């Protein structure tokens, strides 16, 4: 099985070390462009663009990278409860059209009540997943070309429709990650690819089996992906030294503050990440070559595969054997590590190299009539 390898645009900051200004660098448009173009040339399938108040806006960043890349896809967040499903569907179709079919979408429900309140969202965990399920139903139906009437608890639309369809048919793929039962149920019913953070293989296997069984109950099959950091070097010793350097400026106070911030979230996935290290620096290798040091201060994906190229490739293939076909990777700093992964890891894997998409001709059209419909020729009888 050929593997889809993704990279990451660090719109929330970048540098050589975690938890310090030491060795940091400015993340401006030029720097993000360098990373995107490196990923484009090296054969990555796409890049994940993060979302939230600590990041630059993912949609604007993705749009700005379209003209400077050729085949790279952009995995951008959909935010139920923050954006209406109709507006999100129009945005998604436009991004897909402007990128010539290089748009992918990541459903993000949110997990930090404090940040969500700042965005005007006051739903609890269960309610957010209810809202996400309704949002996704409307979003998908619109992109499928339907005129949608929907009266739910959280979404209510009447006569909603898209005038401009996406390039990818039936619609651009929808990604989603969540570890709670209600999250897995949403994934099983509605998404195309289920993402998990980098837990030990036996725990990932459990999640895949659970989601696969739930999807089968809906008569569906879905794909699987995993989100991991990577520290790859020419030798295993060099890789582990690099891992230790990454957290060499971390002090206990910074770790404690980070863990306290994570504790206020209601994310089951974040709780599982925190349980891998319990906020302690000792015994961070939680599974062969799987290191939890990143999660001491970084929310979300908190583990890294560490080793030389063949070693890391072997671990990736272990996950692939569980049914994972997409790997969303990152490393610090992201420009240098994009090259290291491409040069030291890719030669040991069966990497699916994306082709440059051929331009898709759009149907000619006049201006929309009354902002309501596109004029079409009437067939002569």
Swiss-Prot record:
A GO molecular function term, named singly, is: alkanesulfonate monooxygenase activity
Catalytic activity, EC: 1.14.14.5
Role, per record: Catalyzes the desulfonation of aliphatic sulfonates.
Q: Does the keyword Oxidoreductase apply?
A: yes
Q: Name one Pfam family in it.
A: Bac_luciferase
Annotated source species: Shigella flexneri serotype 5b (strain 8401)
Reaction(s) catalysed by this chain, per the record, are: an alkanesulfonate + FMNH2 + O2 = an aldehyde + FMN + sulfite + H2O + 2 H(+)
Determine the domain of life of the protein's source. Answer: Bacteria
- HAMAP family per the UniProt record, alphabetical: Alkanesulf_monooxygen
Q: What else is known?
A: FMNH(2) which is absolutely required for this enzymatic reaction, is provided by SsuE.
Output the Gene3D superfamilies linked to this UniProt entry.
Luciferase-like domain (3.20.20.30)
**Assembly state and interactors?**
Homotetramer.
- What's one GO BP annotation on this UniProt entry? alkanesulfonate catabolic process
The similarity annotation says: Belongs to the SsuD family.
Protein name (Swiss-Prot/TrEMBL): Alkanesulfonate monooxygenase
Top EC class for this record: oxidoreductase
Q: Which UniProt keywords apply?
A: Flavoprotein, FMN, Monooxygenase, Oxidoreductase
